[in-house]
From Swiss-Prot:
UniProt keyword annotations, A-Z: Calcium, Membrane, Metal-binding, Repeat, Transmembrane, Transmembrane helix
InterPro entries: C2_dom, C2_domain_sf, C2B_MCTP_PRT_plant, C2C_MCTP_PRT_plant, C2D_MCTP_PRT_plant, MCTP_C, QUIRKY-like
A GO molecular-function descriptor: metal ion binding
Sequence segments annotated as region (Disordered): 142-203
Pro residues bias (residue ranges): 179-194
Cofactor(s), names only, from the UniProt record: Ca(2+)
Membrane topology classification: Multi-pass membrane protein
Name of the featured protein: Multiple C2 domain and transmembrane region protein 8
Tissue expression from the record: Expressed in root hairs.
Transmembrane portions of the chain: 803-823, 924-944
Subcellular location: Membrane; Vesicle
Length: 972
């Protein structure tokens, strides 16, 4: 008897990669379960189809449900009678969940059949399904097409059930059903179902991680958009250094100093400060104690767009314990204030008499100007007059310290003295310290130990001392210092290339109290040098902004600049709340980094649509570099935040080589942040970018030069060592920039430098796997196209290929010219399809738009020690083992194919080797007798022979190759 339990499948959407020979994708999905089959409607010419169709299957045996499975095939309808499989997925019956726990998930499509010589391969992509069990489907379950053979000729119709009421059936005679409202879904769901084609495994340990993310068929708009701002005030010619931003007018008032202010207290003293008042905005200078001639040198800037009064008041106040006393004031009519236009000279301050009977004068200057004014960067802005830490609001320019690689070769030590036990054999090792970097040699059991170990550290100018000490391990947890030496790095030799040899040096060690070691002098033999021929990497090599060496002599002579990069940071629109959700507004500022120059815009407080309109320039030395712009939420404005870091709102990268010289790129870039809750769009950053080339020839010649300095190729660093040194370099840069005023905080430097790019991420692994498949998709597509040529599926095209083949065989000298001409014509053809805007972060390429919460939870987990429950960590380990087992199988198959090639002449299979040797001897005679052109012609015609001359079984050479032995049978 058939049970009332039904299997529901909702086909949501897909993301497909079309084959080049088919052009667009006419996709539909075929579902198979328990000898039943249904198909969706066909989406014409759509690589991202959305169906939202729901189907229900009868379950014949509920007790055997765990042994059943659901197959979903995605087909491309190439014509009215032909189709091609784009991929399939299989979901096991053990993964079927109740409707209240089911969630829509994207499943990666896999090949229908895999073989080294098979052409049936999936092109990649994903299919989003929601699979659930229910005993009360909304409509009556339609008749399903059975996969078993039915003797009668009657046709069975089935009905697809759209999830939207506005969707209609794709077939005219079908009946559309109106589903009843389903029961409310729970906010907590289990991890994704176990399946053969997915990387997920259902957790069997611990508490499942809540999942609130489903597959969103209509994701937010993450694309880059072109904008048309009024740059430079609408002037076409370059009239100033701020022609990439929109002009913003400010009222500037510079308070310089005062003299002969009257005394207010009974003691005859005065604690003066000045209030600058414009409407409801009031700015205050710092106060001086008992000073009637104070010097302030402070600048206030009031936005003209927020002007609330026509009178500016400058009030002199006396700070008191109970209530501040009024000293005097000066009033200015805004209609009489002059306007200064850069690059005019600064307005000279003047003495103004305070409106007070007792006298007193203030030197100040008042004028209208724009953000191009020199006083703009040092001003206190009207939107942040009440901030406690006003220094963190200003725009500043920083420069990274010059970094060097410090190479230390610890050779040997002599005359170690053990005090007080001189008879004990020591267990010494050398410890090297520089900043926060500590390295150690291996222990050596001798009074005259020899190590001969080399270490590389990162040093930053201005240099700190290098501390080298010899430690004696007297117990497992006890060490004694036998002596140490402080080496000023400024006295160390510098090396430009590998041709120069740095001499070794002996250093005398001292004890902690700076006395010579008793009874003898302990000496340490070292080879220390500063490597000036390297570029110290403090960014990822994939999007680095500088590749120049550390030595200044190499900077100026061998790599001059050939262009200028100009960046205009206009504004941000639609900022969301901070990541904690505790702040109602955002105090946003931007940081841009290119080369060694960092720039920081002013902080616009309490604004969700801040306008910056600040412009900066950099010299360009290498086209294959990237400028990084990050947006942050300033949490240092008011006191009480402690060590709370600035919030990350998003960042973008622009590669210089993708920019056309002389063109202004004005676009709005989405600010994307990946959080444990998923991908979030924080707003849109509006930028204007222009790359100006001063020497086109020099820039083109730069493409032929090595990307890194010579020392990186003469004495290359290991990949692991280079990554460790990069982390030290980022820490050094962050430590130095955090000492500036205002400081550029450590979390900002790490976020811009992407210091965590080396950490494990399942999302990045999947993305890189699909990137790899996309790279080889063209090669696989060419192979499939050639197989279609050989099978004569397109007779006209096959005939044309035969003619071209005959021409090239008869005139082999035309092969290389024709290939070069084809590549040239392909480039000309693709010119009309060239990108019109700079590349931006692709959420689909990054697999960030539809990622499972468990993967995000793992990506944001702490390292190297996890903060998750041991059961979850064990589940992740089991999942990683499952992935590694698949990789292990693929690597083993590839190795087996190579071992079969080696087995041709290894005599592991005597008969196979004998056959191959006979074939080689026969082919030698044939190739000697038959002309080469004739041989190539016959071989090509044989390979492209018509189907009637082909068999249905693989050819003999492939059968022979598959029988060759591999070393798989020797594996344990």
């Amino acid at each position: 008897m058939m049970s009332n339990l039904k299997l529901g499948v909702e086909v949501i959407s897909a993301r497909l990669k079309p084959r080049e020979d088919y052009g667009g994708v006419n996709a539909y999905v075929e579902l198979r379960f328990d000898d039943q089959k249904v198909i969706t409607m066909t989406k014409i010419d759509d690589s991202s189809p959305v169906w939202n169709e729901k189907f229900f299957f009868n379950i014949s045996d509920t007790e055997d449900l765990s042994n059943q499975f659901l197959d979903a095939y995605v087909y491309n309808k190439t014509s009215s009678i032909t189709k091609s499989c784009l991929g399939k997925i299989r979901i096991l019956g053990t993964a079927f969940l109740p409707y209240s726990e089911a969630v829509g998930l994207p499943y990666p499509l896999e090949k229908e059949k895999w073989s080294m010589f098979s052409s049936a391969a999936a092109n990649g992509g994903e299919l989003a399904l929601k699979v659930f069990l229910t005993d009360n489907p909304s409509p009556k379950v339609p008749n399903l097409i059975s996969t078993k053979k039915i003797p009668s000729k009657s046709r069975h119709k089935f009905h697809n059930i759209p999830t939207n009421e506005s969707n209609h059936s794709p077939r005219g005679n079908q009946q559309s059903f109106q589903p009843q409202p389903p029961p409310p879904q729970s906010q907590t769901a289990l991890p994704p179902p176990m399946m053969e084609s997915s990387l997920y495994q259902a957790p069997r340990f611990g508490t499942p991680i809540p999942t609130t993310m489903g597959f969103n068929p209509n994701p937010p708009d993450y694309s880059i958009k072109e904008t048309k701002p009024i740059l430079g005030g609408g002037k076409r010619a370059r009239s100033s250094d701020h022609d990439l931003v929109e002009p913003m007018e400010f009222l500037f008032i510079k308070i310089v100093k005062a003299r002969n202010l009257p005394s207010m207290d009974l003691t005859g003293s005065l604690d003066p400060y000045i209030e600058v008042k414009l409407g409801n905005y009031t700015g205050k200078t710092k106060h001086f104690e008992k000073n009637q001639n104070p010097v302030w040198n402070e600048v206030f800037a009031f936005s003209k767009s927020n002007q609330q009064s026509n009178v500016l008041e400058v009030i002199v106040m006396d700070k008191d314990m109970v209530k501040d006393d009024f000293v005097g004031l000066i009033r200015f009519d805004l209609n009489q204030i002059p306007t200064r236009v850069a690059p005019d000279s600064p307005l000279a301050p003047e003495w103004y008499r305070v409106n007070n009977e007792k006298g007193g004068e203030i030197m100040l200057a008042v004028w209208f100007g724009t953000q191009a004014d020199e006083a703009f960067s040092d001003a206190t802005y009207s939107d942040a007059l009440n901030a406690v830490n006003k220094s963190s609001l200003r725009s500043k320019v920083y420069h990274s310290p010059r970094l060097w690689y410090l190479r230390v070769n610890v050779i040997e030590a002599q005359d170690l003295v053990i005090v007080p036990d001189r008879t004990r054999l020591p267990n010494p090792y050398v410890k090297i310290r520089l900043n926060n970097q500590v390295v150690r040699t291996k222990p050596s059991h001798s009074l005259n130990p020899r190590w001969n170990e080399e270490f590389t550290l990162v040093a930053a100018e201005p240099f700190e001392d290098l501390i080298i000490s010899i430690e004696d391990r007297v117990a497992p947890n006890r060490e004694e210092t036998l002596g140490e030496v402080h080496i000023p790095i400024g006295t160390i030799d510098k090396r430009i290339d590998d041709n120069r040899t740095v001499p070794n040096r002996w250093f005398s060690l001292k004890t902690e109290n700076q006395r010579r070691v008793r009874f003898a002098t302990t000496r340490l033999h070292l080879n220390v040098c500063l490597e000036g021929g390297y570029h110290v990497l403090d960014e990822s090599t994939y999007y680095s902004s500088d590749f120049r060496p550390s030595m200044k002599e190499l900077l100026s002579h061998k790599q001059p600049s050939f262009g200028v990069l100009e960046l205009g940071i206009l504004r941000i629109e639609g900022l969301n709340l901070s990541q904690e959700g505790k702040k109602e507004t955002v105090d946003a500022y931007c940081v841009a980094k290119y080369g060694t120059k960092w720039v920081r815009t002013r902080t616009v407080t309490n604004c969700l649509n801040p306008r910056f309109n600040e412009q900066y320039t950099w010299e360009v030395y290498e086209p294959a570099t990237v400028i990084t712009i990050g947006v942050f939420d300033n949490n240092q404005i008011n006191s009480g935040n402690g060590n709370k870091g600035d919030g990350k709102i998003g960042k973008i990268r622009v590669r210089i080589s993708t920019l056309e010289a002389g063109r202004i790129y004005s676009h709005s870039y989405p600010l994307l942040v990946l959080r444990p809750s998923g991908l979030k769009k924080m707003g849109e950053l509006h930028l204007a970018i222009r790359f100006s080339c001063s020497s086109m020839f020099q820039m083109l010649m730069q493409y032929w030069k090595p990307l890194l300095p010579k020392m990186h190729y003469a004495r290359p660093l290991k990949v692991v060592q280079q990554e460790i040194l990069r982390q030290h370099a980022v820490n050094l840069v962050a430590a130095r920039l955090s000492r500036a005023e205002p400081p550029l905080r450590k979390e900002v430097v790490e976020y811009i430098s992407d210091s965590n790019s080396h950490l494990w991420s399942m999302r990045k692994s999947r993305a890189n796997l699909f990137r790899l498949s996309s790279v080889f998709s063209g090669l696989l597509g060419t192979g499939e196209w050639f197989q279609d040529i050989c099978r004569w599926k397109k007779p006209v095209e096959t005939t044309a290929i035969h003619i071209i083949f005959l021409v090239l065989v008869c005139s082999p000298e035309m092969i290389l010219p024709v290939m070069s001409l084809c590549l040239f014509m392909l480039g000309v053809w693709n010119y009309r399809l060239r990108p019109r805007q700079p590349p931006h972060m692709d959420t689909r390429l990054s697999f960030a738009d539809n990622i499972h919460p468990e993967e995000l939870n793992e990506e944001f987990d702490t390292f190297p020690f996890s903060s998750q429950d041991p059961g979850i960590v064990k589940m992740r380990y089991e999942r990683l083992r499952s992935i590694a087992s698949r990789a292990q199988t693929v690597v083993g198959d590839i190795a087996g194919q190579g071992e079969r090639v080696q087995a041709l002449l290894s005599w592991r299979d005597p008969r196979a080797t004998s056959i191959f040797m006979v074939l080689c001897l026969v082919s030698t005679v044939v190739l000697y007798v038959v002309p080469f052109k004739v041989f190539v012609l016959l071989a090509g015609l044989y390979i492209m022979r018509p189907p009637r001359f082909r068999g249905k079984t693989p050819p003999g050479p492939i059968n022979f190759f598959r029988r060759l032995p591999a070393k798989t049978d020797c594996m344990l």
